[in-house]
Curated annotation (Swiss-Prot):
Pfam families, alphabetized: Fn3-like, Glyco_hydro_3, Glyco_hydro_3_C, PA14
Record gene name: bglI
Active-site residues from the entry: D204
InterPro entries per UniProt: Cellulose_deg_GH3, Fn3-like, Glyco_hydro_3_AS, Glyco_hydro_3_C, Glyco_hydro_3_C_sf, Glyco_hydro_3_N, Glyco_hydro_3_N_sf, Glycoside_hydrolase_SF
Organism: Aspergillus niger (strain ATCC MYA-4892 / CBS 513.88 / FGSC A1513)
GO cellular component: a single term: extracellular region
Protein name as it appears in the record: Probable beta-glucosidase I
Compartment(s) where it occurs, according to its Swiss-Prot or TrEMBL record: Secreted
EC number of the protein: 3.2.1.21
SUPFAM superfamilies attached to this UniProt entry: (Trans)glycosidases, Anthrax protective antigen, Beta-D-glucan exohydrolase, C-terminal domain
Main location class: secreted
GO terms assigned for molecular function: beta-glucosidase activity
Amino acid sequence: MARVDFWHTASIPRLNIPALRMSDGPNGVRGTRFFNGIPAACFPCATALGATWDAHLLHEVGQLMGDESIAKGSHIVLGPTINIQRSPLGGRGFESFAEDGVLSGILAGNYCKGLQEKGVAATLKHFVCNDQEHERLAVSSIVTMRALREIYLLPFQLAMRICPTACVMTAYNKVNGTHVSENKELITDILRKEWNWDGLVMSDWFGTYTTSDAINAGLDLEMPGKTRWRGSALAHAVSSNKVAEFVLDDRVRNILNLVNWVEPLGIPEHAPEKALNRPQDRDLLRRAAAESVVLMKNEDNILPLRKDKPILVIGPNAQIAAYCGGGSASLDPYYTVSPFEGVTAKATSEVQFSQGVYSHKELPLLGPLLKTQDGKPGFTFRVYNEPPSHKDRTLVDELHLLRSSGFLMDYINPKIHSFTFFVDMEGYFTPTESGVYDFGVTVVGTGRLLIDNETVVDNTKNQRQGTAFFGNATVEERGSKHLNAGQTYKVVLEFGSAPTSDLDTRGIVVFGPGGFRFGAARQVSQEELISNAVSQASQASQVIIFAGLTSEWETEGNDREHMDLPPGTDEMISRVLDANPDNTVVCLQSGTPVTMPWVHKAKALVHAWFGGNECGNGIADVLFGDVNPSAKLPVTFPVRLQDNPSYLNFRSERGRVLYGEDVYVGYRYYEKTNVKPLYPFGHGLSYTTFSRSDLKITTSPEKSTLTDGEPITATVQVKNTGTVAGAEIVQLWVLPPKTEVNRPVRELKGFTKVFLQPGEEKQVEIVVEKKLATSWWDEQRGKWASEKGTYGVSVTGTGEEELSGEFGVERTRYWVGL
């Protein structure tokens, strides 16, 4: 009923009950190690997959996720995440598919179906209202039952209809005053009884807060091990009748059922972790990346670009691969492709680069620029039980690393005596340019950076709390030193593990023995960078700006403070557009919405999210027209932060956050209040054009009770009226009649994707159950209400064309269940 470590349940050899392995998660199967782990496939982030609106693609993604899980020896994947982006600022917003429960639930259900067809258990998370990072362990989400049902529980409900998952993970937070991991109404009454689901409920890591209340509420498994709340505490609760034995039996039975469920995989205990990286997997990752790219704007059809004309690439996201967000979603990918690499690989003419601006939150990692004493790329990582001041220290471990950032939460070495240990990281740096270099150190623990035995950064005393490493780390402390081009310098980071820190860790879950990050960059004038980019752009025949966010800016453990791009980025984009407005394409990468004060100047804009291993190739495929963009926004992009419905209620205030927008989340709010967004939910252009015609709505006869089996079927003719093959996403919206309660103007109820050659026409069919298409949650009755009346139907897609129809509901009926 609790784990033995971070990733395994306890085995009972005498009963032939094996341990089970679990692994994150949202956009790739990391395996059992955050630190120095086996590389894995990195999928586009969830908002990117949400932008595909492609249930079949998500099924394929789930199947590959299953193969990756088996390769890592993992029985259970801790994903997908299907929380709702009630604010653009949520640190984990990129982990969820959409702001709408129907889009999110259908995609998640197909993802889980593909995963579980491989025999691997899927885990829907985080159940429920885990929609912010601020005080996430303690905050109480104050939400009406109507909003809880119609918005936040809906994606879980719809996903379960498609694929009852083997597992569900509870959220960290409270809902209306009670932590979800001990909330009987949510776990037992709704999830198990009303939805008739019989899988395993686990807590999020350190998201169990009681013994008896959690057991009695229905929490089967405390995560992670070793237990804090079970073991002897649970034995005492049983002996004192705080927990009945039959309740304990139910919790154990669910764990054993999961053991039996995954048993056909045949994964042995302590299975070795392997890398796949197969050609067909790379093809799928590239296709997913390309199909997620949203064409936001394309005046004068300046896209697609010409491969045979010179190209100037500008921007901070060009030569790095922003492949994923931060936190649980992060992993070590098999490889990455930057946008610059993707463009260069396709172009047949010259491709130049100008930095334009830097956008790092912390200094770029120094590790890739270092060499070991014997000339290998990277640095040595030497572990000791004693601090550097101790004479004749004994070396207990030595590793060779490339990445100068590591979260040691799962680092184990039997020669280490305790959580308190010390590491010397040593490498040699030969700069290519002379100048003053800034160096930065961020630690969970302590760190001192020395260059040729001179202390440049001291992060060992008077430490300041930062946000890195799930909020465990210090801020990045910096120092500077002048370096000469061509001269080699010895760089050493003296690191002490987490217990050596003087940070106040009360209220913070400290994951393991610590973490480190060290980086460096040559000081350079921002004005100089922008001016150089503007000068080059003014003479260029084709310009692509790559800008946006990275895992530093969007990460678990920390919400964003604003929607703006990193400092200097907007100025750079604006000035480049002024210099060459007719030939400049702006490509942004972020997992959630950003402000664009310069957008009126741009003729072409694409949004490319965090695109996984193949992000650069996927972007280039769209920019050059090898893939016709078909993606649609899964979240609304407001003009400014103040326009979003959660603006007044997004953070914990005295331990609670009020979901004051009620059911008016995302597009529901903008349409109800006539607040025009920058780009609406469902927006996305194509290189071709489509027509939609001949909408027909058919319904089945009504029964006395409203159950499954009363489908509403919409058929429509879709034709590719352009000259380029492409895919159209057909969206079905339902407009409710006037009722006794306020309802959204319209709500998405179904969608489908169809690929058409130029001139080709197909009939498209979307089927929705009447109860799902018409109902709202009646708090007085505690039931869904499908009210009598005439319901409007709207069918939309690429462009402004909208088809309208209607259907009737003859009598008001109420229902509960899945």
